């Protein structure tokens, strides 16, 4: 309704972090929206080129939405170092997965959601705040902390948890951007927590700094295959060839 081309969060936990309210345009949902539009536009173009299906009107629609949303994403959320978690709540945290959409776009060979400079600056802030300054990097990347690595709410849930699947995705993003040592450090921390805790046959979604875990057998941990994709440029997994 506000003509910025980006989805608004309603102030309730209305996205995958379902105990973490966002208000207005958010970095997490906005970046995913832009990446989704890029994918939809590419699909429409491919369908027309490969099958002759007329998709000109869809391409025009997706393209206009994309132009509108792109022009407002940085304007509303970029703070000079990383992207604000959202445009209206004023929550002063570095959200670890704020550029999930940019990772997906780059992984799929689409137009990146943000500039390389902004991507690298954001990843640096995420590494320092949510990994290096959270338990010394021994657990993995926490979902969201203040820039100095302290919690906004010491009794918070989702912001203070390490989500295995989110971590594998973030590690893949670091690797995609040429920062393999950081990717390896994040993965090693998470895998060590899972295996040293005897959780390898019930991989949990969330691990905490007080030795608790929840949401076992969660499928988001399959994001670990993103590391294979970024490391091999989508080579087939050995033995997975189809006759």
Where are these regions (language model features)?
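Short, ordered beta-strand-loop transition motifs
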Residues: 1, 79, 131-135
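Active-site core of glycosidic bond-cleaving carbohydrate-active enzymes
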Residues: 20, 31, 35-45, 49-53, ...
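Short, surface-exposed recognition loops and adjoining beta-strand edges that mediate ligand/DNA contacts
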Residues: 67, 72-98
């Amino acid at each position: 309704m506000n003509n910025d081309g980006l989805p608004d969060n309603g102030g309730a936990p209305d996205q995958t972090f379902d105990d973490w309210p966002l208000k207005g345009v958010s970095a997490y949902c906005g970046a995913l929206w832009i990446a989704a539009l890029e994918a939809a536009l590419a699909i429409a173009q491919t369908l027309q080129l490969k099958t002759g299906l007329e998709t000109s009107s869809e391409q025009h629609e997706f393209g206009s939405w994309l132009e509108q949303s792109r022009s407002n994403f940085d304007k509303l959320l970029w703070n000079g170092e990383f992207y604000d978690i959202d445009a209206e709540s004023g929550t002063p945290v570095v959200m670890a997965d704020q550029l999930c959409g940019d990772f997906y776009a780059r992984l799929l060979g689409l137009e990146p959601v943000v500039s390389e400079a902004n991507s690298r600056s954001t990843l640096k802030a995420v590494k320092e705040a949510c990994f290096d300054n959270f338990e010394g990097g021994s657990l993995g990347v926490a979902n969201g902390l203040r820039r100095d690595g302290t919690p906004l709410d010491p009794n918070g849930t989702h912001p203070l948890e390490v989500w295995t699947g989110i971590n594998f995705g973030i590690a893949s993003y670091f690797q995609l951007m040429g920062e393999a040592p950081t990717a390896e450090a994040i993965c090693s921390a998470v895998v060590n927590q899972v295996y040293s805790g005897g959780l390898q046959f019930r991989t949990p979604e969330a691990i905490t700094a007080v030795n608790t875990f929840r949401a076992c057998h969660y499928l988001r941990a399959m994001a670990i295959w993103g590391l294979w994709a970024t490391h091999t440029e989508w080579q087939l997994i050995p033995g997975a060839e189809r006759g």
